[in-house]
């Protein structure tokens, strides 16, 4: 399996937060699977070209949110059901934060639902 591309960091957001979001995206995209080990701190740090302490902080926050279990000497494993939880959370966030902006822009541009739906077939 090929490596996912390195992220482009946003200057105004702490890197550990962006790493958390990266892990969430990779869970949703099923790159990281439930009941499987996450990449080691060193591996993810190397893949993303960041300090291992930054990855450790991101992993600590994910554990605090209840998404992982730590196995001494082995690493972190994603808990069963995490993807469904994250999917619900991301859908809710999209509908509250992103959809109203997108909907407003579609209206402004005169793009109706039929036209929008046709683009999904491309």
Residue ranges and their predicted role:
Residues 52, 60-63, 76, 113, ...:
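A general secondary-structure boundary signal
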Residues 31-32, 36, 63-73, 79-80:
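Beta-hairpin "wing" of winged helix-turn-helix
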Residues 16, 40, 76-91:
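Short, cationic-aromatic polyanion-contact patches
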């Amino acid at each position: 399996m090929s490596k996912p591309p390195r992220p482009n960091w946003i200057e105004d957001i702490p890197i550990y937060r962006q790493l958390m979001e990266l892990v969430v995206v990779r869970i949703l995209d099923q790159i990281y699977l439930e009941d499987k080990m996450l990449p080691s701190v060193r591996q993810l740090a190397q893949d993303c070209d960041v300090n291992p302490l930054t990855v450790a902080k991101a992993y600590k926050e994910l554990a605090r949110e209840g998404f992982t279990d730590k196995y001494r000497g082995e690493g972190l494993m994603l808990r069963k059901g995490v993807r469904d939880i994250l999917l619900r959370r991301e859908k809710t966030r999209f509908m509250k934060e992103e959809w109203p902006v997108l909907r407003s822009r579609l209206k402004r541009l005169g793009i109706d639902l039929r036209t929008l739906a046709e683009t999904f077939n491309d």
